[in-house]
């Protein structure tokens, strides 16, 4: 009702149209109370639907962004069982059909934040395309998929983690999924640009939520230092406690 899931989405698509500064302030406040909610909101807007916002055409934005403001959570499918920080080393593959109307998508994605809840996935996959010299090369393309597509299998939903258990990570298999050509984001072979641009936004905004959690922890430590007495004096009177609080304050700043 408050529009938090559509904070950065333009107003013409039903969002609030917030800039980055306003957005990170909200995330910082959310992070003070619930890390899981901060991750859910940030993953949805910073890397999930951000690809559609930045690289979608007018038709794609009009089709998907209103749903992403209201009843859809989005997921970013980049990491794979054998592919982590090497974003260009995708083993998931897509191949165009002979009539050029679909991409046939095959592969597996891992650690997709909110993937078990999402109505829209941005999926990175290697595709054979012709290079500038006319030779065939493999490049990453970005495709939009939905969980109801035939061949999409969300076969593992994980909340058994050390923390942030309010988010559902997922492992997703794509088995001969027919993705319409209209679901291609940006251009063929430009998916790595899509992925890295979205990750840059995520680094900025997710860190705001973590800052909120750190600030909250510092506030609690200060409160405890003032109210907890040992040796007939509050803990805040001891030099070691003051040094620790000062260090926490410096890190938060």
Show the residue positions of the predicted features.
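A short, Trp-centered hydrophobic/proline-enriched beta-strand micro-motif
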Residues: 70-78
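Short Ser/Thr-interspersed hydrophobic loop/turn segments at strand-loop and sheet-helix junctions
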Residues: 27-31, 125, 145-150, 176-179
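Short Gly/Pro-enriched turn/cap motifs at secondary-structure boundaries
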Residues: 82-85, 111-114, 134, 161-168
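A structural signal for short hydrophobic beta-strand segments in well-ordered beta-sheet cores
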Residues: 92-96
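A short core secondary-structure module
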Residues: 101-102, 106-155
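Internal helix-loop-helix
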Residues: 4-71, 112-120, 252
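Buried hydrophobic positions in well-ordered alpha/beta secondary-structure cores of metabolic enzymes
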Residues: 3, 10, 26, 57, ...
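Glycine-rich beta->alpha junctions and the first turn(s) of the following alpha-helix
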Residues: 154-253
């Amino acid at each position: 009702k408050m529009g938090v899931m559509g904070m950065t989405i333009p107003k013409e698509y039903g969002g609030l149209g917030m800039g980055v500064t306003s957005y990170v302030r909200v995330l910082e406040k959310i992070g003070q109370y619930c890390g899981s909610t901060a991750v859910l909101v940030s993953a949805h807007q910073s890397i999930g639907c951000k690809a559609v916002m930045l690289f979608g055409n007018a038709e794609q934005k009009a089709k998907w962004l209103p749903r992403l403001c209201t009843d859809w959570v989005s997921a970013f499918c980049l990491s794979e069982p054998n592919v982590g920080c090497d974003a260009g080393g995708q083993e998931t593959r897509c191949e165009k059909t002979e009539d050029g109307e679909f991409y046939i998508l095959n592969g597996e994605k891992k650690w997709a934040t909110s993937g078990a809840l999402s109505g829209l996935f941005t999926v990175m996959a290697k595709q054979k395309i012709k290079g500038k010299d006319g030779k065939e090369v493999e490049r990453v393309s970005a495709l939009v998929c939905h969980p109801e597509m035939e061949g999409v299998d969300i076969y593992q939903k994980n909340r058994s983690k050390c923390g942030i258990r309010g988010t559902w990570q997922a492992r997703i298999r794509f088995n001969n999924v027919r993705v319409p050509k209209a679901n291609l984001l940006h251009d063929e072979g430009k998916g790595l640009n899509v992925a890295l641009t979205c990750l840059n936004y995520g680094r900025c905004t997710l860190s705001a939520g973590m800052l909120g959690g750190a600030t909250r922890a510092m506030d609690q430590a200060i409160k405890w230092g003032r109210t907890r007495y040992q040796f007939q004096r509050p803990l805040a009177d001891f030099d070691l406690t003051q040094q620790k609080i000062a260090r926490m304050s410096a890190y938060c700043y």
